[in-house]
Amino acid sequence: MHTLIERLEKVTNNKELEEVRLNALGKKGVFADKFNQLKNLNGGEKNAFAKEIHHYKQAFEKAFELKKKAIIELELEERLKKEKIDVSLFNTTKTSSSHPLNYTKNKIIEFFTPLGYKLEIGSLVEDDFHNFSALNLPPYHPARDMQDTFYFKDHKLLRTHTSPVQIHTMQEQTPPIKMICLGETFRRDYDLTHTPMFHQIEGLVVDQKGNIHFTHLKGVIEDFLHYFFGGVKLRWRSSFFPFTEPSAEVDISCVFCKQEGCRVCSHMGWLEVLGCGMVNNAVFEAIGYKGMSGFAFGMGIERLAMLTCQINDLRSFFETDLRVLEGF
């Protein structure tokens, strides 16, 4: 009977387990045979042998149940291994990439926010004061013309630039101010390089007079352009904007031809990327600021994206052809 338990310990599956059970507990099994032998014994010898058989039978049944449980757990473990889904496998589903405009916006924000610039969000619908008058754009200025600006009946308009956000920020906050604004702007244009809706980014820094100089503006702009375009050359040109004085425009060496001359740069070797300058005192006076100085800059996000993604047609950004967008 000791042999039965030894055989039980070597069992590895249900089939072997059933064979051992029948051999031990079946009608013609070992224990049935032992009980049949009792009829040939008398008195105390019969009782002693019966107790011994009963003891071994209980021991076998206990060992059998433990082995049965162990085999069930083993088979379950093997089944789970076979049916397991390996979540570490690479997903074969094609994932999308970031839209060029979103990529460009995020890259701009990643540069300016660590420098302390706060991201401001303004309304798309503005009034005359915030979009024009406060920015030193008088009533006769061409930008107010119906051919360039979308007007509503209640004297409201779709903002033509993100500069109104600068005015709102200066009205609502006290200097020092460091802010950037990214958002949609609207003008009545539609061709290879213009769309009725486009995106701008503008920045503004304001502090007490004497604390902000043109050299601060120059340092910020040059750091940003080198961060965004890498090792390009920069060229500063004097310019005119009603809301800044002095004003400048900044060009970068052509990222397409490396200044050898191409159609994109009109064979000049330079590409215009932004405008900037010191905030005009007329702007400060319009909102009631006194004794302040500051600088502002602005650039088109589509323009930056076109240069980094080498896109020739601005309208590609707003088309729904995934074959085009997936190429960026």
UniProtKB/Swiss-Prot annotation:
Xref: SUPFAM superfamilies: Class II aaRS and biotin synthetases, tRNA-binding arm
Top-rank lineage group of the source organism: Bacteria
One Gene Ontology molecular-function label: tRNA binding
Keywords tagged on the record: Aminoacyl-tRNA synthetase, ATP-binding, Cytoplasm, Ligase, Magnesium, Metal-binding, Nucleotide-binding, Protein biosynthesis
Cofactor detail note: Binds 2 magnesium ions per tetramer.
Stored PROSITE patterns: AA_TRNA_LIGASE_II
Enzyme class: ligase
Binding site for Mg(2+): E245
This protein's GO CC annotations: cytoplasm
Required co-factors: Mg(2+)
Primary site of residence: cytoplasm
Keyword ATP-binding: yes
Subcellular location field: Cytoplasm
EC number annotated for this UniProt entry: 6.1.1.20
One GO biological process term: phenylalanyl-tRNA aminoacylation
InterPro entries: aa-tRNA-synth_II, aa-tRNA-synth_II/BPL/LPL, Phe-tRNA-synth_IIc_asu, Phe-tRNA_ligase_II_N, Phe_tRNA_ligase_alpha1_bac, Phenylalanyl-tRNA_Synthase, tRNA-bd_arm
The reaction(s) this protein catalyses: tRNA(Phe) + L-phenylalanine + ATP = L-phenylalanyl-tRNA(Phe) + AMP + diphosphate + H(+)
Subunit and interaction comment: Tetramer of two alpha and two beta subunits.
PANTHER family in alphabetical order: PHENYLALANINE--TRNA LIGASE, MITOCHONDRIAL, PHENYLALANYL-TRNA SYNTHETASE
Family: Belongs to the class-II aminoacyl-tRNA synthetase family. Phe-tRNA synthetase alpha subunit type 1 subfamily.
Protein's recorded name: Phenylalanine--tRNA ligase alpha subunit
Gene: pheS
